[in-house]
A protein has these predicted regions:
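Alpha-helical interface subdomain recognition
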Residues: 1-83, 99-104, 111, 115-116, ...
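Structural signature of FAD isoalloxazine-binding scaffolds in flavoprotein oxidoreductases
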Residues: 63-72, 131-135, 185, 214-215, ...
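Helix-loop "lid/cap" segments that line or gate small-molecule binding pockets
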Residues: 91-100
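A short, Trp-centered hydrophobic/proline-enriched beta-strand micro-motif
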Residues: 115-126
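Conserved hydrophobic/aromatic beta-strand scaffold that supports enzyme active sites
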Residues: 120, 136-138, 163-167, 171, ...
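A short core secondary-structure module
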Residues: 122, 149-193
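Cytochrome P450 C-terminal beta-domain/meander region
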Residues: 131-149
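Flexible, small-/acidic-enriched active-site or ligand-binding loops
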Residues: 134-136, 154-155, 186-220
Length: 371
């Protein structure tokens, strides 16, 4: 595989770096966002064209691929920013592009690209762990469409999403792939209850309960009962973007840790002079290169056209991110000492984000079964 970047890639990365440096100053990274800050940053990302990056041009996008998404995710990871980029632009956007009719894409994608609205995929359910195929939420057909009843858990940025792409079962039972259908549901529709909560890293997710929610027939994405392949592809695209984000987080983690070791003194000498610390930093640098390679491989596999290869590479990358991310985060905290556990120390926020990324969409043990 050729992992080299062309001039357009470098220009994109530089533009996102400038945006992050302005919107996420280093001394404030990891701090909780106010609603005004979140709205302003989201509008700024829309202004740069990041929110419609993979969308068709006639829907307000720039028709870029997963490598460009990877570069953006890496820079957002360095800044501990991005908000709903993975949930809305990557995962929900992929579902709309793969399943939506031209009319449906024109209906929803321009709003996502402009930042006027966010979307999120309501996928997982209670007791299913990471098995996204175990869907019990029922969609009952009516003369005007469908009626949805059930509950979804851990919907990323679910309490800020105006559009929910709900994976429901129209036929079959248990964990059958056949019978899954995606519905576009307005989050403010009657019968939709969204209960938001903070995640470990200070971001947001939500539990969504749907009680007799009426969905019109023009809000069904794709052929009823045949959505499984598209859902899996969108999920893999989101996982690849998360792996890229983890690369950025680890890169920033290394920079902050190295600076601490250079400036902090013990026994009259900087910590960087101690061999054990040098070995730890060398291990971290090696791990970062591993993560970069696997994140690139996962991104390039997203549009490779071979689902089996995509699944293997994306899951292999997620295994490495889940294992090394937590390990590197805790190692950086240890190199900072007790202060590394505090909210005032930026390293603690990088570590928490890596732990969350390691759990999202499947942990190491789950993806090892999939490789």
């Amino acid at each position: 595989m050729d992992f080299s970047l062309n001039d357009d890639h470098l220009a994109l990365r530089e533009a996102v770096q400038r945006f992050c440096d302005g919107e996420y100053p280093a001394e404030h990274r990891g701090n909780a966002e106010t609603p005004e800050q979140a709205q302003g940053r989201w509008a700024g990302m829309a202004g740069l064209g990041l929110l419609g990056l993979p969308f068709p041009a006639d829907a307000g996008g720039s028709e870029q691929g997963p490598v460009e998404v990877m570069l953006v995710a890496q820079e957002l990871g360095r800044a501990l920013g991005g908000g709903a980029f993975v949930a809305s632009t990557v995962m929900a956007g992929q579902l709309l592009m793969r399943l939506g009719s031209p009319a449906q894409q024109q209906r929803w994608l321009p709003g996502l690209a402009s930042g006027e609205r966010q979307a999120s995929v309501a996928l997982y359910e209670d007791g299913a762990r990471y098995d996204w195929q175990r869907v019990q939420l029922q969609a009952r057909a009516t003369s005007q469409g469908h009626v949805l009843n059930g509950r979804k858990t851990g919907v990323l940025q679910g309490d800020s999403a105006g559009l929910l792409l709900v994976v429901a079962r129209t036929s079959g039972a248990g964990d059958e792939r056949h019978g899954l259908t995606v519905f576009a549901v307005d989050a403010s529709a009657p019968g939709v209850q969204v209960r938001g909560f903070d995640t470990l890293d200070g971001r947001r997710a939500a539990h969504v309960t749907l009680t007799d929610v009426a969905v019109a027939s023009d809000c069904v994405l794709g052929t009823p009962g045949e959505a499984a392949d598209a859902v899996e592809a969108a999920l893999d695209a989101a996982i690849a973007a998360l792996c890229a984000e983890a690369v950025g987080v680890v890169d920033a983690l290394m920079v902050h840790t190295a600076e601490h070791l250079r400036t902090r003194k013990q026994f009259g000498a900087p910590l960087a002079k101690f061999q054990v610390m040098q070995h730890r930093m060398a291990d971290m640098a090696i791990a970062l290169e591993q993560l970069k390679s696997m994140a690139c491989a996962a991104a390039m596999a997203v549009d490779a056209g071979e689902p089996a290869q995509r699944r293997r590479l994306v899951s292999a990358a997620k295994v490495l991110v889940s294992q090394l991310g937590r390990q590197l985060g805790l190692s950086a905290i240890q190199m900072h000492g007790a202060m590394g556990m505090t909210d005032e120390c930026r390293v603690s926020h990088f570590a928490k984000r890596l732990i969350v990324i390691g759990q999202l969409f499947g942990d190491a043990s789950w993806h090892l079964k999939r490789v």
